[in-house]
Regions:
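Short domain-boundary/entry signatures in modular proteins, especially
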Residues: 18-26, 75-78
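Acidic Gly/Asp/Thr-rich repetitive segments characteristic of extracellular carbohydrate-active
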Residues: 21-51
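Short strand-turn-strand beta-turns centered on an Asx-Gly dipeptide
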Residues: 28-29, 71-72, 250
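Surface-exposed loop/turn motifs in large extracellular/passenger domains
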Residues: 1, 59-67, 84-101, 108-128, ...
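A recurrent domain-boundary module in secreted/ectodomain proteins
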Residues: 3-21
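Glycine-rich repeat segments that build the extracellular carbohydrate-interaction surface of secreted
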Residues: 41-55, 66-73
Length: 320
């Protein structure tokens, strides 16, 4: 009977076909000796289930739609990014405790050039060594780099304890925007949690984002309509570009909200923003200061904050 079984399959004690004991991943009842092999063979919309803790660099090709079920196991990188996605990838964890980890300097747990959805599970960098904004410790990077991709966080955890690199970078270019939507889940970092970089489109409607520094740092277009930000929310301007932020709905921000002008000197030339960072507050609750600020020398133009709604309990307490 076993002569007729596919490679990666065996019979259990009941005679049912199951993945072989040495398989690290499966699609249905067929096992594979590497996660990459399973993904390569996956048909449109297939679910690849991790069966063991595995060390491997994985690439999702373009025009591939696949779900990765961590199944309570840990996927750790070998030398590069743990997962590089060019296709459509959903990450979930049907058991609990499943993790995508990266342990290498300048590499991430997930680099997304395609379409990625995080439903459950944890993305992290367990060897992150950044101890301050100026000290990488020789091992630091983003946990997630959404690079000209589309990513939706529907649940799960994205966590790091580092204080050198942002937790998530959302960055596009002049031809392709990056789109990051956070609907739920928990994000936590010792430094900037969500960096919405150049040509990034950020929408936050839920979840909890915690940072010892900035929960959100915005250099492009951002909307926060829900969720809880434990940390500052800053919108920045530099040179000829400026971030635009709208805060509304039932968003709660436990931290300061500022529009910041960034002034810097390069080869003895002072670079001033020629446009203003702008924050519109239409709703939500802000437990912190609200205003305009600058980094570096005094700017020629100030950031703009417009308030048409919202609750400000911290400001009220200070005025008593």
């Amino acid at each position: 009977m076993t002569d007729y079984l596919d490679d990666g399959c065996e019979l259990d004690e009941t005679g049912s076909v199951v993945p072989s004991d040495d398989s690290v991943a499966s699609i249905g009842n067929k096992g594979y000796h590497s996660l990459e092999a399973a993904i390569t063979e996956a048909k449109e919309g297939a679910t690849v289930t991790l069966l063991k803790n595995v060390t491997e660099d994985v690439t999702i090709p373009a025009n591939t739609t696949v779900t990765l079920d961590l199944n309570g196991k840990t996927l750790t990188n070998e030398s590069s990014h743990t997962i590089t996605n060019h296709g459509t990838l959903t990450i979930k964890d049907s058991v609990g405790g499943g993790t995508v980890d990266n342990v290498t300097h300048a590499k991430g747990a997930l680099v997304n050039y395609g379409n990625a959805i995080l439903e459950s599970g944890t993305l992290t960098r367990s060897k992150e060594a950044g101890s301050s904004p100026s000290t990488s410790g020789g091992n630091s990077w983003y946990v997630v780099d959404n690079n000209k991709g589309t990513m939706t966080v529907k649940g799960g955890n994205i966590v790091s304890t580092g204080k050198f690199s942002s937790l998530i970078r959302n960055i596009g270019d002049s031809t392709t925007k990056a789109q990051l939507t956070i609907e739920s889940g928990k994000l936590s970092n010792g430094f900037i949690a969500v960096k919405n970089d150049d040509n990034g489109d950020l929408k936050i409607s839920g979840g909890e984002i915690t940072s010892d520094d900035q929960a959100v740092q915005n250099w492009s277009q951002a909307e926060i309509s829900g969720g809880t930000m434990n940390g500052a929310v800053y919108t920045w301007a530099a040179d000829n570009s400026a971030g635009q932020m709208t805060i509304s709905g039932d968003a709660k921000i436990n931290g300061n909200v500022y529009s910041v002008q960034y002034v810097y000197t390069d080869n003895e030339i002072v670079h001033q923003p020629i446009v203003s960072a702008a924050t519109k507050i239409e709703g939500g609750t802000i437990v912190g200061n609200v205003g305009a600020a600058y980094s570096g020398s005094a700017p020629n133009t100030l950031g703009v904050v417009t308030v048409s709604g919202g609750n400000f309990p911290y400001l009220y307490r200070k005025s008593i």
